[in-house]
Amino acid sequence: MTLAQEMTLLGQKAKEAARLLAKASPAAKNAALTRLAALLEEREAELRTANAQDLDAARARGLDAPRMDRLTLHPAVLADMRAACLHVAGLPDPVGAMDSQWQRPNGLLVGRMRVPLGVIAMIYEARPNVTIDAAILCLKAGNAVILRGGSEALHSNTALAALLRQALEEAGLPADAAQLVTTTDHAAVTELCKLDQYIDVMIPRGGEGLVRAVTEAATMPVLKHYKGVCHAFVDADADLDKALDIVFNGKVQRPGVCNALECLLVHKDCAAAFLPRVGRRLGEAGVEFRACPASLPLLGPTAKAQSPDDLGQEFHALVLAVRVVDDMDEALAHIARYGSNHTEIICTNNHEHAMRFLREADASMVAVNASTRFNDGGQLGLGAEIGISTSKLHAYGPMGVQELTTTKFVVFGQGQVRQ
């Protein structure tokens, strides 16, 4: 069987599974999710063994520390996966829900009903937990999913996909509602991108190169999880103690993730008071600063002169670009030029400035006096997320269960005919 035939077969199986899953009862879907949570606990030793194989191979290839962290199924990550299964099982089922209803003058009752998208192809890189996060959301929303993870996580993803299929079968649902692409041939993604007769939506989640390649090749709609160039603007009248905690959390907690802070913008009126504190606290945590001329002498020994390439950069590391700005106009102009529509935050005690920033900063999440790290489906109350969309059509921001459905019009009549 050729690669094209293999991918076509996956698509055909997924399309049929999606048809069956769309009419599955909420109880059956929730039973599969609950069983999956139990299997993740019962088979944890097997999962850790599979993950160790991936980690050993990654070390041998010299994978960097942030990517090793994303690849690792830490105990906390496994616990979060189990919790996500149970949380999503407890969410209201969106399928069949009526978003709105109204009556026309001729007596027709018109409504909008939530329905699954159909078949979703998820293309992602080093994080094996995405296998579970993506599948459980697709399942809850009545969608079949084709999963194509990175080659570095193949053993982990294969073990997780086996549990997914077991949970589906035990709940009386089609196992083909969750299929994993097991070939590491990059051409598999190209072949999937051609299958618009079977795949309804493509979701790439990973590096900029992956997202661009899928977007350019896909013959079906793409929900882009693009890069996270996240900014924090510390306004002149910010609470500097809170701002320091927010900046530290955004950069240091998990520097390799998409909602990590990448660029700090500081109002010139508080730069002298704030930046030395940033330099000490973040510098002690190992952060290297890429500093503009005004901030360079204020940040201490871990600061280096900024190059043009440092702006708009997703570092995936303990590196932070820093720039002093004259006012909010300059901060917003910087974000408009270098941001990636992911996450932007302001630290300020000025309500007018806060509201202006919320209106004008163009991102899927904009926050006041809170860390960039909160742009996450779980943190925003959506349960697990399939990704953070930086596209504005269909979904913008973390994509939970609701975002994996669409609406169709339903009409109730009593024999009306159009005049």
Where does each model-flagged region fall?
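Rossmann-like NAD(P) dinucleotide-binding subdomain of oxidoreductase/dehydrogenase enzymes
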Residues: 90, 98-241
